[in-house]
Amino acid sequence: ISVKGRQVWMSENGTFAFGFSQVSRDHYVLGIWYANIPGNRTLVWMANRDQPVGEGGCLTLGQDGNLQLVDEGSTIWMAETTGLFVQSGEMQESGNFVLYNSNRNIVWQSFASPTDTLLPEQQLTETLNLTSWNSSTDVSTGHYSLKMVRTPVSLKLALNYNAPSGSSNYSYWSGPEIFEGSDTVVVSLDHSGSISMSYSNSSNGLLYIYQNSNRLGENERILSRITIEHDGNVRLYRWDANNGSRWIVDWAAVSRPCTTAGICGNGICKLDSKSKPQCHCPTGSYQLDSTRPSLGCLPSRPTPDCRSDNNASPPYKIMTLSQTKYYGGSSIIANYSNISSMSGCGDICLSDCSCVASVYGISNHKPLCWTLKSLLFGGFQDLSYTFFVKVSLDNGTLGNHRAPASSAPSSNREKEKSRLKMIVLGTVLGTAFVLCLFCLFFLSQHIYKEKKRNFGCFNFYSWYSCKIFLRRSADGDQQFQTEAWN
């Protein structure tokens, strides 16, 4: 199978296809997608999501039995089946691509290495996870994952935000817990469209995460999938062939989008009038990229170095963001339950050099306060909480704070653009001036010769004059030209 050859390996009834799929200009992934539905391809598995291949991409089975993806002589991905005596492969109707040995035993399968989607008959174990795309158009590994997390006596399915720094992650949603036994716990999606946790070799202890109440016929099946998406939510999709031929969301883990950790990077998420999430930066910081608010915010000035003996740091104050909660996770310095007042939570942060913010709230009629050493996982509107941010006294006011030109990368870029424009304008005007002088010199010589030949007086207005005009070429470039006129 090669990119140039455009070969596709179909399942028996044509439900799924295995082959190369284009993800951007001149970039392809080896993947599996639904082959019998109209519209854009819905990929359910990818081998090389983080390293797409070009037109030279080719899938080969080596003499050692290893299935590998090669591009321009370099191995991009391999199934690691060396020595397993691979004899054949099959694209199954379930969406699973499998490799068999001579005894028809499965030695490798795509179901055992999922990307962002779980299909019926596929099982998610504790050692596997689903990982989101990086954006709606970028298939590379994103910052969200769906996996089972362990408690002292149980397992539960959880959504996790993996901070871009890679230093820590935060679980912001979890399903019901299932107690551990001697058997492996699996998460699966059945053909009726229900999601459950169970023990792999037993029907006992079945625990539904979502149960579809619509009854299907005995042999009736629907196209369905569980997909974790770039916005941090995991959704159960069902293909509706009767009403517009489209994917319909039957269930979603997160019902309030702003409660998704990292939806605004380390910024604050608020819903607009249309209930769509909008990203804001806490006072004392600015957006890293206004066109990609999910990248989060950067501080306008560096945080104090508490290890230094230098006490020349600028004085700080606490700014209050009411009705705002901020995720803590590994950023929490300490928890306090003996805070006598809301303002006391801010005062604790102000007196702690390592604290950059603190959060106050009421839980079970008891006050809570936690201090933070960094802002990593983002915040959102919540009536029960108050967010305190430490800022320097000269930092400005509340709102979407923009850094001064000296510290904001975007401002530096604007200054560079202005400087470049001035250079281009100066060069163009200088060139035009030189051309005009050359034209005048040429014409003056011509007139002098005419005068010398005619021995007569001449009228000033009989001089040839020079004009410069601007012409735009067919390809949009601007070109200066000169011409003589009288």
Regions found by a protein language model. Give the residues of each.
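Residues within well-formed alpha-helices
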Residues: 348, 475-476
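Cytoplasmic C-terminal tails of single-pass
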Residues: 450-475
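Protein kinase glycine-rich loop
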Residues: 482-486
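Beta-rich ligand-binding surfaces for carbohydrates and other polyanions
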Residues: 1-450
